[in-house]
């Protein structure tokens, strides 16, 4: 039975998603600011967990954090033609300040390649200054016409890395390092979301990039979500902003740059990959609260005994598990069970007077709602048992998501088969079409090339649209 207030996925997937966001208390609509949301404490705690996991990996690969201005001179955006064309419709401008018209308008940061490129041109002088590896955590504004909480909002939070290198090979190595060792590693291991690592098509690549790499995930409605991108910018931005260095032979060279980013849409990916009709489901490694304890008692005397047992039990957990004891006296145990299930806490521990007598507790797994996920276990050795169960849940969520993707991905050999397959999931096919061909397919099916998988077949096949022989396969899907 679906939770009250949550539309079943099978009935209306889009409304189900919005219901989860609101019922799990993740966000509120900022009606007074078009397309923006308020991150409520529960939603922001998820973003903090995402930040920690990514920030550790970003720093482990040799990068450092910095912060650059929110306002960017409009002239900076105009310096890279392909870049400005790609972002112009989404840009918000500041034209007045201090009661006066500005001599030059500012744009509110849609992304930071241009202003960071300006500063890099001042900081980089010699090959000894390279590589320059900087990341920033920031907010971004893009004037979206159709918004949806976390997935597409006018203002969103993200990290964006910007690096400078002496050679194209170094820049390419950096781009793939971020894709594999930071983004894919985090999303698969911490978020339990399987991803396809690939290259963007010319139509879908980042404006101004030489090559764009991505990780693509499948949501429970079969649609794709781009979970992260890593761009080799070539020398385009280096030439636009004069980022040069003197090499070992005392010759001035243009540098090679990269940029890469993920955003709060990862929260949307988490919701749509793992959650169910009972509410939010959070993978244990990412969960702000991994275990919630619900003490059960009927009077003050029982309360005293139970709470003493809870304190002894949880004393062992400190530093090992992220836990919360729900000792609110004004709510029934049933209400608490429902609330924590709705909020996606991976494990619920129930303990009452009878459990204390038996030396046991009841454990309920969030990934298995109802009787299937409930069991009684001894209090002795509980800490180790909970830690093992959290890891078991983490792996189970990943396997379930991977199995779903595999059963909703199919190889297609004709355009008609592609049209049918994108109704239910990913269509994998041989492709030798043009950008115009891809645009026509999007107009007819609402599907795009999500990526050209890095894992390509050895044998050749025929393009589903042109009939030409090719060894390149792509993934077509509808996307968020």
UniProtKB/Swiss-Prot annotation:
Name the enzyme group at the top EC level: ligase
Q: What are the cysteine partners in each disulfide bond? A: none
In terms of Pfam families, this protein maps to: HGTP_anticodon, ProRS-C_1, tRNA-synt_2b
Q: Which GO terms describe its cellular component?
A: aminoacyl-tRNA synthetase multienzyme complex; cytoplasm
> What is the documented function of this protein?
Catalyzes the attachment of proline to tRNA(Pro) in a two-step reaction: proline is first activated by ATP to form Pro-AMP and then transferred to the acceptor end of tRNA(Pro).
Q: Which NCBIfam families does the protein's record reference?
A: proS_fam_I
Record protein name field: Proline--tRNA ligase
Give the source species.
Roseiflexus castenholzii (strain DSM 13941 / HLO8)
The top of its lineage is:
Bacteria, Bacillati, Chloroflexota, Chloroflexia, Chloroflexales
